[in-house]
Every structure is written in structure tokens, then in C-alpha cells.
Amino acid sequence: DVEYKAVVVDEPGQKGKVIITERLTFDIHAASKNNLFWELWRELPEQYVDGVKVDYKVNSVKQIYPDGRVYVYEESPKLYWNDSDYVKENTKYGPGKWFHSEGPYNPDQRRYECVLFYVDGLYREEVVYEIEYEMYNAGLRFGDCSELYLSMYSGDTIKYLDSYKAQILVPNDDMPAKGNYLVQTYGTSKNDFPYKESADANPGYHTFSFELDKWDLRFNPYNEYIEFVLLSYGEDAFSFTEHASVNDYYYDDSLDYIHRDMNEY
């Protein structure tokens, strides 16, 4: 299960940033008591969009216990990989620590962008984590419009999701006016999914939200992802991208092309 919240931050030097908080529930079923889980992970969709790289910065990882207790994980100084790391006498790298593997993506070298949680040998149990990370270049600016593009979940593990709940919060000062924006969702076997809007769910923000259950979370091989796009134009073309990075199409009028691609999808 995933509970996702993204907050748009359009401030100097922030490069189209959103701050993301996720609560992840893992239902662990190890093959045997002699073959336990020693690490869990959350893939971070890794890609270049219009010439700029979607970057991540991990701020914190916490384990949430059923009684409400919170255990704050420390950052591990290196990738916890060799068999010699997995011994009780050496806790420098884990368990109880996390590591941000930055990639770049290379399956031949077993290299992916993800957050790894080093755990103490799990067999059959349910564990909950809360992670906070920053995603850069989610806000893209063009000559006559802007796009908030959130690649929220993808990869092989998407087929194991039981539920996915999300909120996207845009500060009121950065939210385009009605008639100056549209929203498109992407993914699942239906190709898109419904969402809701609220002006008062989170004070100070305009909120987009959606909830997907096991029935919704069915995918074809060509659309194993969950994505959200907010497109602004007209008088509010740059309402949430004043401080966005310069991309390959920063100075080019792109609204018609984006509309065409949305319609074709």
C-alpha cells in the first residue's frame, strides 16, 4: 500500500521542486526462515524529461509501529551489498539504516535509483515506513505553458500494489485560475483514472487527489505506471514554474503539441 503526498515548491533555486511524503506498507512473505528479507526498497522513477534530469534528494526514513511509536532510520554510509555486511557484529551499514542509490540505471550492473531500507531479517510480517524526499524538475516551463509532471510509481513492483492514495498540493498563490489549466492522469489498464479537486482540503493549497484499489491497480505491459500531469496556460502559463530549470523547449511554444499528445493518448 502507498499513501503519497506531493507539495509544489516554486522558489528561487528549487528547480521545479516538489516535496514528497510517502507512507509505504510492506506485507513481507519470505520463502523460509532461512531466507529472510534484509532489505526493502522504493524505486524512484529515473528519467530525463525534455533534456533535464529528474533528480531526487532523500530527507528522512522512519519506521512506524502499530502502537504509534516512530523509529528514525539513519543514513548508511555506503551501499549495503556484500555478504560480510550482513552480520550482527557489524552494524555500521545496517540494519536500521537507509541508503539512497542514485543510479544511473543499469540492470546489468544491478544499479537502480531507489531508497533502500536495511532491516533485521524479516520473515512473515507487515511493516510501515514513512519517507520524505525531494523531486527536482517536476515543474517544466515552455514558451506558452507549463507542466507539472509527476511520475509517481513504476517498475516491476507496481503489480503487487493493493492500494494507492495520493494528494498533490499546489499553493494557492501558484495555482492557475479555472479555465487556465487542465489535468491528465496516465496508467493502469484503463489508461487513466479519475481524480478529485478541493480548494479547502488543505488550507493554503489547492488539492488534487485520487484513490486506487486492487481492482483499479491492474496494468498492461505497456502502461505499468501511475502518472499525474497539471498543465497551465493563458494568463497563468507560468504560475508554478517561475523558478523552473531551462529545458530543451523552455523558449518554444508547446501547448498545441502537448494538447495533441494528450488527445492521442
What are these regions (language model features)?
Residues 1-265:
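Lumenal/extracellular ectodomains and adaptor appendage modules
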